[in-house]
Amino acid sequence: TPTQYHNEGFKHPDLRYCGDINANVPVPVFFAFDLESLLSMEDVSFSEKSQAGGGCQLCNTLEEFSQFNFDQIYNNRWMQNIDEEKKYRQAELITKGPFSINSCLYAILCRNEVEKITLLNLLRTESPKSYSKYKDKIKVCKENMFECNGLYITDCRYFDGKASIAFSNTYEKRSYINRYKKTELRPLEATIDFDWVSAKTLINRQSTKFQINYETQSGVQFSGLCKPKNAKTLYTKIIIEGHLMCFMGQQLVEAALL
């Protein structure tokens, strides 16, 4: 998307684009659609360039579509003429009125396995019907679709009374910090909940508040977690500055991630 580089998060509040506190998508998810199905729908138009700023001619025939400059549209190399080349990279498909994603949804793409499982657990607990409907379409994206230049959870595991959480520590994240940091970054406020469950019944919850050094911290470990006698599953939720970043489940008997 046009602002993905800046908005893909979690971005520290002091690094957000133009100081906008809302310029932050903590856990990005992409919907991938079947192009042939999209183009075959009634009332679908397409443009070779972005419609922003006065727009570009809208087309709706196969002949017009075949004349598009796809070398520019799919070009991911360094831009020589930013203003012009960016317009091509924002080519659009447009439909009139509401659009039902079910008509041509191909996949729902997540950044990594932790975020995939988080989405599945949210759907399963909040909307079982949606979980059944979309679970087979939710996948980890294997392509270079995400910027990976913010803070996110890369691993979350429990073993022998200890929980280990790993944070992203990518070159892209460090580069973004170096480019846009103007002042010392305050620690982020976070909460982790450990829910011990048996047959969907909550037996015990342990909650801990902690802080995260956005620049340097690669992980955190929690010890002294006492498993209740009848607990069969441990659900772990991590919330950073009010945003749910991780929702993992682990079967305690079989040590399998849910």
Identify the residue ranges that each predicted region occupies.
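A positional/architectural concept
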Residues: 257-258
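Active-site-proximal loop/hinge segments that shape catalytic or ion-binding/gating pockets
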Residues: 2-211, 218-219, 223, 230-237, ...
